[in-house]
């Protein structure tokens, strides 16, 4: 299968089969793939908090109100950046965004649904996650990825290629 053909059906999933756990080996594979992401000077400033304790889900949905569908999911991964390990000030955000994308693609490859819910740059959300997970000052939360088994087949995406978005050699 062509890489793009495998990638094209990936969608954000917000409906999950409840009470279905993801095997530990699959979780490890997903995180290993996330860590294959490129990073400035290969600093790899990412840190991952895996949350499979469903008693924490209500607190998470209060901290990030646009992820209420977490309640039915199997787990969540909070992707954080370590500012003591970044290449330059602010580089953790780009590096951790690349790791988040790899994480989403790894979920898709394993037939798991996932949805990227933003934490950064919303200061209140960041503070909520820092408090909720006792993050030290040099660890910054970037994203929350909700993961689970899709309750339904995601609808097929429209063609996203738009020639007008491409600029050759200048604007």
Q: Model-derived features: where do they sit?
A:
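Acidic, surface-exposed loops and disordered segments
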Residues: 1-171
């Amino acid at each position: 299968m062509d890489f793009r053909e495998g990638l094209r059906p990936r969608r954000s999933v917000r409906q999950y089969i409840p009470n279905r756990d993801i095997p530990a080996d699959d979780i490890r594979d997903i995180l290993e793939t996330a860590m294959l992401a490129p990073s400035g000077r290969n600093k790899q400033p990412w840190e991952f908090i895996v949350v499979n304790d469903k008693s924490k889900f209500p607190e998470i949905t209060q901290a990030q109100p646009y992820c209420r569908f977490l309640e039915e999911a199997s787990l969540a991964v909070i992707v954080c950046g370590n500012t003591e390990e970044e290449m330059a000030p602010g580089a953790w955000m780009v590096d951790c965004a690349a790791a988040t994308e790899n994480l989403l693609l790894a979920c898709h490859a394993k037939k798991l649904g996932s949805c990227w819910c933003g934490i950064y740059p919303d200061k209140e959300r960041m503070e909520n996650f820092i408090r909720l997970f006792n993050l030290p000052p040099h660890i910054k939360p970037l994203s929350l990825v909700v993961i689970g088994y899709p309750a339904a087949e995601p609808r097929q995406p429209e063609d996203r290629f738009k020639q007008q978005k491409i600029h050759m050699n200048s604007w």
